[in-house]
Amino acid sequence: MGEAEVEKSQMWLYHLGVRVAGIVAEKWFTPSVRGEANIPETGRAILASNHLAVIDDAVIPITVKHRDVHFMGKMEYFTGKGIKGKLTKFFFTNVGVFPVDRTGGASAESGLVTARTVLEMGEVFGIHPEGTRSPDGKLYKGHTGVAKLAFETGSPVIPVALWGTNVSQPIGVVFPHRFPVVVTYGRPIEVPKLEPEEITYERLRGLTDEIMRKIMVLSGQQYVDMYAQERKKQLKEEELLKKEEAREIPE
C-alpha cells in the first residue's frame, strides 16, 4: 500500500482522536446511534454512507466504538507543501485515512487497491458512494466502486444513514454548530466473492443501486437519479447564468 499503508502501529492517533472527539461530540452533537450491533465484532465489512458534511468521517468512527474505521481522503490532504502539508499528511495517515485521486479512471484505482488491502486485512472500510457531499441534502446516485470492492473481497456492505450533519456543518462552515446528529447502521447486505470475469457492469450497478435504496430508506432522503458531481456542476452553471442575466438588466 506504499506511503498510504494503514499499519496498526500507526493507529494510536486514531484511538486518541476518537476518544477526544467522542467526549466533545457527546456534549456538542449528542449523537444518537441506532443499529450499531449490525457492525460485526470481527472481520471485514464496508460501511456505505450518505455524505452531507465534512464531519461525517469523524461522526462515524466515534459512533463505532468496537471497530476501527478506515476512510479514503482526497489526495490534497497528502500532497501539501511545507510544514503544514507534512503535518496534514501525518495526521490523516495516522487516523486511518488514505489518499484517493477524485479525478477518476486509472488515477482513482490506486485508492481502490488500498481499500481492498484494508478489507483483506479483516478491517472495516468506510465509503461514501455518492463520491462527494450532497449539495442540497438530497441523496444522489452511487458510484459503483463500493460494489466492486464488495464483490472482489466478499465483504458485507452495511448501509449507513447520517442525519443532521449538514445542519450542524453547512457547506462553507468550518466549525460545526450545536445540533443533534443521528447515525443509523442498517442490516448487512451479504455479498459473495466473485472472480474478475464474473463482475459485470450489470452486477455492479445492481448492487450499488440496492445499497443506495437501503440508505434512502434509513435516511428518509429524497433520491435523485444523477451523480452529485453533475448536480454541483448544474448549480454552478445556474449561478453563473443568474450573474450574467443580472449584468444585462438595464439600470
Predicted stretch roles:
Residues 2-13, 109-251:
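Non-catalytic C-terminal accessory region of glycerolipid acyltransferases
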Residues 8-28, 80-96, 174-180:
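Alpha-helical membrane-targeting segments
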Residues 14, 20-51:
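Helix-to-loop junction immediately C-terminal to a conserved catalytic motif
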Residues 20-22, 94-102, 129-133:
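Short, basic, glycine/proline-bearing loop/turn elements
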Residues 33, 84-85, 109-112:
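Structural motif corresponding to alpha-helix initiation and N-cap regions
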